[in-house]
């Protein structure tokens, strides 16, 4: 038994680029009219060269110049947990939830949040316009003693220098957790303010710009969300101006309060309550992969042949189409991509893999209605039947493609959730 090589059906099908390489789990399947797939998988271990080729191709499609090697701080920190909530929301939105059709099995999370979702309805709204979400870990945090009237501040810094080119910030949030306070400030009201640091000075306070503030009771607990969209855009365009954020807590009469005493959790708190930043991005330009030529030389050679007997060739074509009826018609077949088998489980959080599928089969005259043939393909089939040396048969290609979302760490241990379009074949047809 051997693994069949897959044929490139159309230039927009990414599967064609991986056809010689997908040997780890490919299968031929009968695809019935009710979209039920029956398959018998063929397994064999990848050789080192094959693994490297696959890794290089998939990284290129994911838009990554190299394999990320993060200094992992744990998948159960607050930032990865928040991003997992967004990942699950995006999967449900695009049909990847239980019973959904958008993402094919197995498309599931590696771990669960096992608690109330961190993401809000507003975050889900931001997902609608975004094609990439990044969370950023706090690089520096320490309390500073300033001159009157501000005595207590907490500083946060985030590295936005690794943002891919062509991505624009559509929304950005700073998130910090506030615990319930049982003593001292029982009935007190706090004003929590977040500032952008414009310029730092020796011996006096930094120049600050107020970004957002919230007023709340000392007894309140939960995640506090501050809008920092404006400064995030500025930092992406001018990274040298990124001097971080400052946070202050005051009573309504202006008394400065230590953020820790107000219940705000810093980097030394529990993993699932540490502060972080999240930004939503949308691509301002589309990048296309170059399409490799496959078989154009052979096709031109076939077209250059002039038959001596046109009628004999036409009769041979009739026989060819008769035998095509006995061969498999254009259908969807199973093809599973396993990130775990590629050894990427240390930086890809979710999914472990996904069912990509591919299209293969005959597009012979006459085309049946279930082949999802275009009008052009119908005409092309007829012309090929009459004059096969002039026009080739239509190709079996995807007619519907779906996206997948991939959640992963970058080199700086930031968590990225990115949507990749046209990655899963939903339906096949003749083109």
UniProtKB/Swiss-Prot annotation:
Disulfide bonds join 330-396, 359-428, 363-430. One of its GO terms (biological process) is embryonic limb morphogenesis. InterPro entries: Cystine-knot_cytokine, TGF-b_C, TGF-b_propeptide, TGF-beta-rel, TGFb_CS. Keywords: Chondrogenesis, Cytokine, Developmental protein, Differentiation, Disulfide bond, Glycoprotein, Growth factor, Osteogenesis, Pharmaceutical, Secreted, Signal. Expressed in the kidney and bladder. Lower levels seen in the brain. Residues 291-311 are annotated as: Disordered. Residues 30-292 form a propeptide. The keyword Secreted applies. GO terms for cellular component: extracellular region; extracellular space; vesicle. It comes from the Eukaryota. GO terms for molecular function: BMP receptor binding; cytokine activity; growth factor activity; heparin binding; protein serine/threonine kinase activator activity. Glycans are attached at residues 187, 302, 321, 372. Pfam families: TGF_beta, TGFb_propeptide. It is found in: Secreted. Residues 1-29 form the signal peptide. Changing residue 198 to P: Found in a patient with unilateral microphthalmia, optic disk and chorioretinal coloboma, mild learning difficulties. Belongs to the TGF-beta family. Growth factor of the TGF-beta superfamily that plays important role in various biological processes, including embryogenesis, hematopoiesis, neurogenesis and skeletal morphogenesis. Initiates the canonical BMP signaling cascade by associating with type I receptor ACVR1 and type II receptor ACVR2A. Once all three components are bound together in a complex at the cell surface, ACVR2A phosphorylates and activates ACVR1. In turn, ACVR1 propagates signal by phosphorylating SMAD1/5/8 that travel to the nucleus and act as activators and repressors of transcription of target genes. Homodimer; disulfide-linked. Interacts with SOSTDC1. Interacts with TWSG1. Interacts with FBN1 (via N-terminal domain) and FBN2. Interacts with type I receptor ACVR1. Interacts with type II receptor ACVR2A. Interacts with NOG; this interaction inhibits canonical BMP signaling. Interacts with SCUBE3. Interacts with ERFE; the interaction inhibits BMP-induced transcription of HAMP. Interacts with TGFBR3. This is Bone morphogenetic protein 7. The gene is BMP7.
